[in-house]
């Protein structure tokens, strides 16, 4: 009899335990259930960072007419969405994104997928842009949560697109009751800063799109940008100068030297600058020296190569200033990455630390150039 009662009691305890487990599991599912989202195509919001509207694909960086006029390698890179961003206003407590990439290669050997093909979200807080969240892709088509748990108040947000991949489509997901609207207008007289250069300008090898130096600078100065960085292909071709001259920027920043040998700098740079000056006689132009590579202190041959190119660029700058070009500015390269050799991932391409250091050196010069152009 005693054994029978003990058995019944054990069964009752097991049933109770299973019921409790079931109730807890259901409650957990209810608590953790994702809210239904409303998806907004970002084309309905404010797209910044595009220099031309007549592009072959919406998120391309060069106009459709450039295909066939420029080298194929440059055209292919122009399909990367570097520098393009979406600005919007929302009271959402969580923000998600779903996006489709154009290239299946979502990462590089020296650069993470989060920078190559990911999204990067900032929010304006107390008048400054602050990082809010990022989304790392797993495949060509992705759906990821950028941020959650925010208080419900209206905020201005800025979402950067991938640096080294193209975008087929992009949507922002917010809770059904939330708003997602056009942001406050930029000042009517604001013009973008146009950056032309190499993989470094394009953003290699930032951990996420917002850490490329053009993005850092334009957040700090609260201005718009057009990123025309082309990895391994910034060699100051006249066709590229013609395209750049079609734009109407506040400032041109030219940073192509890492892709050019000294003879190319000597023969091509003066003509490139002159093509811009012919169309924009007073627009400030900033010339940027090659950075000092990480192993330069113990590698004389490498140091000699970029030192020669820098000296030629300096001479071009001085000759133009002497001839009366008062809106030409210059950034030396020896301090751009710091002095400890810790600013790159592979001796050449900056890490996030390197990009922050570059922005620190460039910011005061860009400020002066922007003032000069007003």
Feature annotation, model-predicted:
Residues 2-3, 7-9, 13-192, 367-374:
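N-terminal secretory targeting modules
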Residues 107-112, 203-211, 303-307:
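Glycine- and acidic-residue-enriched helix-capping/strand-helix junction motifs
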Residues 190-214:
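Catalytic nucleophile-elbow at a beta strand-turn-alpha helix junction centered on a G-D-S/GDSL motif
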Residues 205, 217, 234-279, 290-297, ...:
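Oxyanion-hole/transition-state-stabilizing segment in secreted/luminal serine hydrolases
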Residues 214-227, 318:
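Short helix-loop-beta junction
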Residues 293-331:
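Substrate-gating cap/lid alpha-helix
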Residues 345-374:
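Histidine-centered active-site loop/cap adjacent to the catalytic His
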């Amino acid at each position: 009899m005693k054994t029978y009662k003990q058995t019944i009691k054990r069964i009752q305890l097991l049933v109770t335990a299973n019921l409790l487990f079931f109730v807890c599991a259901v409650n957990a599912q209810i608590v953790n259930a994702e809210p239904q989202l409303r998806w907004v195509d970002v084309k309905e919001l404010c797209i910044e960072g595009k220099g031309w509207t007549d592009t072959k694909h919406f998120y391309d960086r060069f106009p459709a007419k450039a295909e066939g006029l420029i080298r194929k390698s440059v055209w292919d890179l122009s399909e990367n969405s570097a520098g393009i961003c979406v600005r919007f206003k929302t009271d959402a407590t969580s923000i998600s994104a779903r996006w489709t990439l154009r290239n299946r290669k979502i990462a590089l050997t020296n650069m993470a997928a989060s920078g190559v093909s990911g999204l990067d979200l900032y929010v304006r807080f107390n008048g400054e842009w602050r990082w809010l969240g990022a989304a790392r892709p797993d495949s060509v088509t992705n759906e990821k949560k950028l941020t959650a748990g925010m208080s419900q108040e209206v905020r201005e947000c800025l979402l950067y697109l991938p640096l080294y991949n193209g975008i087929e489509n992009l949507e922002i997901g917010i809770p059904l009751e939330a708003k997602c609207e056009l942001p406050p207008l930029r000042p009517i007289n604001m013009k973008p800063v146009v950056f032309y250069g190499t993989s470094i300008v394009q953003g290699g090898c930032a951990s996420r799109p917002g850490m490329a130096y053009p993005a850092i600078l334009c957040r700090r100065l609260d201005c718009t940008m057009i990123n025309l960085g082309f990895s391994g292909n910034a060699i100051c071709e006249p066709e590229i100068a013609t395209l750049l001259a079609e734009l109407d920027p506040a400032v041109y920043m030219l940073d192509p030297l890492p892709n050019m040998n000294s003879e190319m700098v000597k023969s091509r740079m003066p003509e490139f600058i002159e093509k811009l000056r012919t169309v924009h006689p007073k627009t400030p132009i900033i010339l940027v020296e090659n950075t000092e590579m990480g192993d330069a202190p113990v590698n004389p041959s490498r140091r000699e190569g970029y030192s020669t190119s820098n000296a030629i660029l300096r001479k071009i700058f001085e000759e133009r200033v002497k001839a009366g070009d008062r809106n030409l500015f210059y950034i030396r390269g020896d301090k751009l990455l710091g002095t400890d050799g810790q600013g790159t991932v592979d001796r050449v391409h900056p890490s996030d630390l390197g990009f922050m250091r570059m922005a620190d050196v460039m910011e005061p010069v860009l400020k002066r150039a922007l003032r000069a152009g007003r």
